[in-house]
Amino acid sequence: MNSRSFLIMAGLLLHAAHRADAQQDDGLYNQLHQASVEILVDRRLAGCGCIVDPDGIVLTAAHVIKNANRQIEVMSASLGRLQGSLLAMDAAHDLALLKLPKRKKPHPYLKLVKKPPAAGSTIYLYGSPLFRHDVMVPGLVARKQTTFEYVDGEYIEVVHIAGLVTRGFSGGPWVNREGELVGIQSSAMALGDAHQGLAFSAPLEAARQLLKSREWTKYATLGAGIEEIWEQQPGYLEKLPEDTSGLVIRVVHKGGAIDASGIAAGSIISAMDEQPVERRDELLRLLWRHQPGETVELEVSAADGTQKRTVPVRLGRLGPDPQTPIPRTKVVKKERQ
């Protein structure tokens, strides 16, 4: 084969591969279009979700619903506009389950992937950014392990995804090329109003567990926002003893566990139950071994690193009260069969 023939053959192969990828992406889009929904809360478009069960179970972000005392409707091209009822919530992973009315035939739905995608894998998000409907965007799994982010005054466990994700995508499905669900969009990293190119997704295993139990979860909280020592400004670090390690309490929620224990903002947590902590993830993973209402012992010192002492802290509960009445709303439009 001469060089001219080789180049022609290579070009044809590349063109065929491109067409195959385009067809696969179009099929993926159509699949997401059928199984994804928009969620109206008190008649306003609040976020997105996806059907994950043929009986009409919808998975979305907890912050889209916020609490059960709301009028919830679900809207999609395939279903029309229907009532929805809140089944369960996992505030620690920003997840909520909704239930759609029964219908004669199974609902279109997304299957959960069996194994989380590896770091660097391409995945896709579907939703309604800034009130624009039916948008699919790509992203990359940016971190192998889950981590914790401080969102709306509480820590949630998330997966980091590299991608520009705007408001309105909340609750939307992240899927792989095969259309299998790998996560639910939660929020994103921002400095002020500037997006930093890192999105936060609810972990796959948390979604799987919520679907299995269909019960409100119980996770403990300290009622505080913390920063790692090495995040602090040079002037602050210069005033600390060189051997100081731990986490700086930057925000104390009034009436929360830290506040009730008399620990002030600026204090430094160096251990929980005699186990040293230097990173947020270390502290929060230890914390979540406990149930709300249990007591832990925190080793804390003053803001200057002195006056180290051990303080008992009775843990609070993360998220809304599950005993709040669940609303029953009217069907606005009959579903499409």
Model segments located where?
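Active-site loop architecture of trypsin-fold serine endopeptidases
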Residues: 42-47, 64-72, 106-107, 126-138, ...
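Bacterial N-terminal signal peptides
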Residues: 8-15
